[in-house]
From Swiss-Prot:
Species: Cupriavidus metallidurans (strain ATCC 43123 / DSM 2839 / NBRC 102507 / CH34)
A single GO molecular function term of this UniProt record: RNA binding
Cystine crosslinks: none
One GO BP: tRNA pseudouridine synthesis
Keywords assigned by UniProt, alphabetized: Isomerase, tRNA processing
EC number(s) reported in the record: 5.4.99.25
Family according to the record: Belongs to the pseudouridine synthase TruB family. Type 1 subfamily.
Catalytic reaction list: uridine(55) in tRNA = pseudouridine(55) in tRNA
Function recorded in the entry: Responsible for synthesis of pseudouridine from uracil-55 in the psi GC loop of transfer RNAs.
Active site: D54
Protein name listed in UniProt: tRNA pseudouridine synthase B
Length: 314
């Protein structure tokens, strides 16, 4: 009898990995499970995701590793873009294809009516969060009430739909696909249901793919299978650099003297910026680099000086 552990390859130790993984999340996998798998494949010491994507949704799930986790909140707050496939004529218990059909109605709308209905939901709108959501009521997720057959009061929340574009409309099949760019906290399931009610026939979501989070897009995103196929030493190279999260912040480059003071948390007066460096406007958050182009952190211009807000150790 042999010891199976003797033939098992030794587990490699974790390592410091810094950057952003643009993951194309597959259908059926939770965001937390995706994070656990990616962290294991990269052998990363520290990782965090930037807001959940439903198991039934696919697409862009940015995962932050190492020093990039200091900026994950920025992606939580960022606008999102989705492509949503909607079936008209039926409402379900969950607002998506996982639920049981509650009511079926005849679809009589034309393309113009669909255009008008969609237009009603652009701009600032109020949404009532769905019962099948992770929002909590008295410390308990709403979906737990829903699974117990209970409906609880939910306060409407203001969200912003920046744009809705109809990509494909097949009214004989009672289906359409729309691209939605929206603020954080927007429920696309609820939007699909609301459009259906505006048309008088009801609707539910049958497919959802996230294509952008802030300035990050699916272009260059990788799958878990693609990471697994790479040699271990090559996997960290699949991450985007930390400053991929900071592209909306103007860059500031410091010389060696100013860099040393900055890394000690000291403010850098406007007059001490290197010659030729354009100072950011008052109140602006800037990404700060050292004299060798290494990201040092972010700082805000306040009262004529750059004040460090978050430092990174790369």
């Amino acid at each position: 009898m042999t010891d199976s552990s003797a033939t098992r390859p030794p587990r490699l130790p974790r390592r410091d990995v810094h950057g952003v993984l643009l993951l194309d999340k597959p259908l059926g996998l939770s965001s937390n499970d995706a994070l656990v798998r990616a962290k294991r494949l990269l052998r990363a010491n520290k990782a965090g995701h930037t807001g959940t994507l439903d198991p039934l949704a696919t697409g862009l799930l940015p995962l932050c590793f190492g020093e990039a986790t200091k900026f994950s909140q920025d992606l939580l707050d960022a606008d999102k873009t989705y492509e949503a496939k909607v079936r008209l004529g039926a409402t379900t218990t969950t607002g998506d294809a996982e639920g049981e059909i509650v009511v079926e109605r005849l679809v009589t709308c034309d393309h113009d009516a669909l255009d008008a209905a969609v237009a009603r939901f652009t701009g600032e709108i109020e949404q009532v969060p769905p019962m099948y959501s992770a929002l909590k009521k008295d410390g308990k997720p709403l979906y737990e009430y829903a699974r117990a057959g209970q409906t609880v009061e939910r306060a409407a929340r203001q969200v912003t739909i920046h744009a809705i574009t109809l990509l494909d409309v097949d009214l004989p099949a009672a289906m359409f696909t729309m691209r939605v760019t929206c603020s954080k906290g927007t429920y696309i399931r609820t939007l699909a249901e609301d459009v259906g009610e505006a048309l008088g026939c009801g609707a539910h979501l049958i497919g959802l793919r996230r294509t952008a989070v802030g300035d990050l897009t699916l272009e260059g995103a990788v799958t878990l299978e693609q990471i697994d196929a790479q040699a271990d030493e090559a996997r960290p190279g699949m991450l985007a650099p930390v400053d991929a999260l900071l592209q909306r912040c103007p860059p500031v480059h410091l010389d060696a003297a100013a860099m040393g003071r900055f890394l000690q948390g000291q403010r850098i007066a406007r007059r001490d910026l290197p010659e030729g460096q354009v100072p950011p406007d008052e109140g602006t958050l800037a990404r700060v680099y050292g004299d060798e182009g290494r990201l040092l952190g972010v700082a805000r211009m306040k009262e004529g000086a750059l004040r460090p807000e978050r430092l990174v150790k790369l």
